[in-house]
Amino acid sequence: CNNFYASCERMFAPDLNGRPVVVLSNNDGCIIARSDEAKALGLKMGDAYFQQAAFLRQNNVAVFSSNLELYGDMSTRVMNTLKSYSPVTEVYSIDESFMDFTGINPATLRDFGLEIVQRVKKNTGIPISLGIAPTKTLAKIASKLCKQYPKLAGCCYMHRPEDIEKVLRRFPIGDVWGIGRRFEKKLLAANVATAYDFTQLSPEWVRLNMGGITALRMWKELRGEACIGFEDMPQPKQQIR
């Protein structure tokens, strides 16, 4: 889901479309969700509300306290819509899930994905980014591309090796699912700046320097080998983008 908490608030206040929106933590201490317009203003996740209050007023930013009951209800609606398209759908977090499209004609996957994006929007009002790829790690990257390139209309289907390589050559290593800040620093120190650079490392280096099997799975996934099952995925980040 795109900017999930902010999108939920907009569902019940259509006049907010096009206006910057932020959602605060339970005690109104800091920003935990931002609309694209709020991001464009330079507002960051974790910004203290009291430090940004004047700036928010000056820029006509709509500010909401967290409404977890609302977000939970909207999440259920989104996930139920997704499950109607795949019998194997695993909810990963309140605003994210993985779906298994095994058995669907690859030639129709792009149109199938667009149909899902449009149906979720119609049923719930929530915009989503759907990444389709040979592995979960690549699908996460494809989903990020949807948010960067509006012309994709919410669905990015990566399957040709040459296209995947082009994307990985431009994709920062720190943005790869499961890397984390500690490994990002280690990889940058080893001149590994992109996801593609990471795929060019030897499996021995990955195993020795990054803690064994989990990192090796990530390396294999980026190389197109599906090896992260639904039952052994990394834990999601706590904050909602």
Positions of PLM-derived features:
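Residues that scaffold, gate, or flank divalent-cation-dependent active/transport sites
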Residues: 1-94, 98
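Short acidic, glycine/serine/threonine-rich loops at helix termini
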Residues: 8-10, 33-36, 138-146, 211, ...
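Short Gly/Ser/Thr- and Asp/Glu-enriched loop/turn motifs at secondary-structure junctions
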Residues: 92-96, 133-136, 235
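Catalytic palm subdomain of template-directed nucleic-acid polymerases
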Residues: 99-117, 191
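Long, highly charged, low-complexity intrinsically disordered interaction regions
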Residues: 109-174
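DNA-contacting surface of Y-family translesion DNA polymerases
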Residues: 175, 183-241
